[in-house]
């Protein structure tokens, strides 16, 4: 079951082959990183020269249009779009904190969470809830 992952800004394909390709920035340095497209698989391929340590905050952007992928709803998360077999489509929301295993697949019907740091508390990507 192959999903296509796309940039929410330019609709460019982010997984032309096996991995999702994103630009990552941290402490004035940038690199292309490869993420697993499999939900719950948190393995990341990072160049040796681009050192990341647990709890580092990483800024992700589209490698095609360079737009920031930080979520407008939660600055500690990034988001991209996905489309799967049939009409299944939605948003993937994932942590920008290196080593923080938290990913959500959000569709019109449901939210699926993956990772030991993910949980239902406070997760609401439909916009309903308390007013700020």
Task: Annotate the PLM regions.
Residues 4, 59:
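Residues immediately within or flanking Cys/His clusters that coordinate Zn2+
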Residues 6-53, 73-91:
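Short recognition patches in nucleic-acid-associated and regulatory proteins
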Residues 8-10, 62-67:
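Short Cys/His-rich metal-coordination motifs, predominantly Zn2+-binding knuckles/fingers
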Residues 48-52, 75-132:
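Short, intrinsically disordered terminal segments enriched in charged and Pro/Gly residues
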Residues 55-57:
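Acidic, metal/cofactor-coordinating or nucleic-acid-engaging core segments within structured domains
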Residues 68-72:
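Amphipathic alpha-helical interaction segments
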């Amino acid at each position: 079951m192959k999903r296509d992952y796309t940039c929410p800004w330019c609709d460019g394909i982010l997984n032309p082959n096996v991995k999702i390709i994103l630009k990552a920035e941290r402490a004035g340095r940038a690199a292309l990183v490869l993420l697993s497209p499999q939900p719950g698989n948190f393995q990341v391929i990072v160049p040796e020269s681009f050192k990341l340590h647990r709890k580092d905050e990483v800024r992700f952007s589209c490698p095609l249009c360079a737009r920031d992928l930080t979520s407008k709803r939660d600055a500690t998360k990034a988001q991209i779009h996905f489309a799967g077999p049939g009409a299944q489509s939605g948003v993937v929301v994932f942590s920008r904190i290196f080593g923080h295993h938290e990913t959500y697949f959000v569709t019109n019907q449901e939210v699926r969470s993956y990772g030991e740091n993910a949980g239902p508390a406070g997760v609401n990507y439909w916009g309903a809830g308390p007013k700020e």
